[in-house]
């Protein structure tokens, strides 16, 4: 019974992490592509590293490293790798909870910083190609114009701005989009946390099962 439980846990955890490793590779690949193509540009000039490409590369790399530890730890029945996998998942989970709390506590300050960053970047639209790409992408996708409206463009709105007198500014449009999709964002966030907790549970259970099997075999 002990050996069959060990094998089942081992392969469940291996397949679980293999799927996430493949997902990590895909995310990393998209991130590298966006970095090379510089498709979406830089929106916040005071945070030049905060681009879609960089975020995807970091997230993809973290997923790949954690999933690799989980794969190798489970298939090799290596307690050290399994505990490393467990600890990394725990650190990531705690970091996510901390970030969520900070975002909630400092929501007003964050809103102010975002508005200031957008107002600053819009001044460099014509002088910085990367900023131009970022603004063109956002205005096209959200069907908005400027930070608070088309009047933000002192020299006239660019072609990426939709026409019409009732066009919203991108700051309020982005906030509206976030609030209208808050339920879906919350569900996705909860699912990610549940998956992480499941991964930690599998790793800890497999680690304990390895101990029990070793004791039963007299190792």
UniProtKB/Swiss-Prot annotation:
Induction: Expression rapidly increases in hematopoietic stem cells during stress. Keywords: Cell junction, Cell membrane, Glycoprotein, Membrane, Transmembrane, Transmembrane helix. Disruption phenotype: Lymph nodes of cd53-deleted mice are smaller than wild-type mice due to a marked reduction in B-cells and T-cells. Cd53-deleted B-cell progenitors have diminished IL-7 signal transduction resulting in altered gene expression and increased apoptosis of developing B cells. Mice have largely normal hematopoietic stem cells under homeostatic conditions but they display a prolonged cycling in response to stress. Cd53-deficient myeloid cells have also a reduced capacity to undergo transendothelial migration. Residues 33-54, 107-181 are extracellular. Residues 1-11, 70-80, 207-219 are cytoplasmic. Structural component of specialized membrane microdomains known as tetraspanin-enriched microdomains (TERMs), which act as platforms for receptor clustering and signaling. Participates thereby in diverse biological functions such as cell signal transduction, adhesion, migration and protein trafficking. Plays a role in the activation of monocytes and B-cells. Acts as an essential regulator of B-cell development by promoting interleukin-7 receptor/IL7R signaling. Also promotes, in B-cells, the BCR signaling by recruiting PKC to the plasma membrane in order to phosphorylate its substrates. Belongs to the tetraspanin (TM4SF) family. This is Leukocyte surface antigen CD53. It comes from Mus musculus (Mouse). The gene is Cd53.
């Amino acid at each position: 019974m002990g050996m069959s439980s060990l094998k089942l846990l081992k392969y469940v955890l291996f397949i679980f992490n293999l799927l996430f490793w493949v997902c990590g590779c895909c995310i990393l690949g998209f991130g590298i592509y966006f970095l090379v193509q510089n498709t979406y540009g830089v929106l916040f000039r005071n945070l030049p590293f905060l681009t879609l490409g960089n975020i995807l590369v970091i997230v993809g790399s973290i997923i790949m490293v954690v999933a690799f530890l989980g794969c190798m730890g489970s298939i090799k029945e290596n307690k050290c790798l399994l505990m490393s996998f467990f600890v990394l998942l725990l650190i990531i989970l705690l970091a996510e909870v901390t970030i969520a709390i900070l975002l909630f506590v400092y929501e007003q300050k964050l809103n102010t910083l975002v508005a200031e960053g957008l107002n600053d970047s819009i001044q460099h639209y014509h002088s910085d190609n990367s900023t131009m790409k970022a603004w063109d992408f956002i205005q096209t996708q959200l069907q908005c114009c400027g930070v608070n409206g088309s009047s933000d463009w002192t020299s006239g709105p660019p072609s990426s701005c939709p026409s019409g007198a009732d066009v919203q500014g991108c700051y309020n449009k982005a906030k509206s989009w976030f609030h209208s999709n808050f339920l879906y964002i919350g569900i996705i966030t909860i699912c990610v946390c549940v998956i992480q907790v499941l991964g930690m549970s599998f790793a800890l259970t497999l680690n304990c099962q390895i101990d029990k099997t070793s004791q039963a075999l007299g190792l």
